[in-house]
């Protein structure tokens, strides 16, 4: 209930205000992407972004709200960002951190601009630590029960982070789970360490889910166009 109230509150404070008050006064195009209290404002022109940043602070102060300084910054993002970054002496444009993803400027095989997305480093570390902690708690279970629980965790991770361009981060999680699982099986084996050949036979009988992209570039592009 409290979450619904907060959502309705921010819909009034932010969403309606941005659409009805801010956008009509801008020189170029703009949009907002928000999930609960995390949001990104996108502007065609830097001058609009600066004006909106000042107006946003005033708007929030009316409701005794403030922006988190560590999570708030103005970033140039888009097809001209690489060119402008090199002129300022930077190797690459700045990145955006949003909902557990690092968003960065990149190019496709044809050289056209594309938004790249990968798991944020801090989120990846936390995910690996959480997986390792949960695996310690299941070491007394049968191998089949362990496999079912591990696949349940992997399925949830892939479903959220399985987005185009993020396959390497998914593979890292998969390799880490395999490593922790073999280590866990070795710690409870009276014969000692489970060698890789033994572990391969275990995986053949009790396979772990392979990394999967639930949102490939083609579907991601269609959503962006909508």
Regions found by a protein language model. Give the residues of each.
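Non-catalytic terminal/accessory segments
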Residues: 1-226
């Amino acid at each position: 209930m409290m979450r619904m109230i907060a959502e309705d509150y921010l819909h009034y404070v932010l969403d309606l205000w941005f659409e009805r008050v801010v956008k009509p006064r801008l020189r170029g195009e703009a949009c907002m992407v928000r999930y609960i209290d995390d949001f990104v404002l996108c502007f065609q022109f830097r001058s609009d972004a600066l004006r909106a940043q000042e107006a946003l602070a005033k708007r929030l102060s009316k409701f005794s709200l403030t922006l988190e300084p560590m999570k708030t910054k103005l970033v140039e993002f888009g097809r001209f960002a690489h060119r402008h970054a090199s002129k300022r002496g930077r190797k690459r444009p700045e990145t955006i951190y949003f909902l557990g993803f690092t968003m960065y400027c990149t190019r496709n095989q044809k050289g056209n601009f594309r938004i790249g997305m990968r798991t944020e480093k801090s989120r990846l570390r936390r995910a690996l630590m959480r997986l390792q902690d949960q695996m310690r708690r299941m070491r007394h279970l049968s191998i089949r029960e362990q496999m079912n629980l591990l696949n349940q965790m992997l399925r949830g991770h892939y479903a959220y982070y399985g987005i185009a361009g993020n396959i390497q981060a998914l593979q890292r999680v998969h390799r880490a789970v395999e490593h922790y699982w073999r280590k866990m099986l070795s710690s409870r084996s009276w014969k000692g360490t489970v060698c890789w050949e033994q572990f391969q036979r275990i995986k053949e009988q009790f396979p772990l889910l392979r990394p999967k992209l639930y949102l490939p570039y083609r579907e991601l592009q269609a959503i962006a166009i909508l």
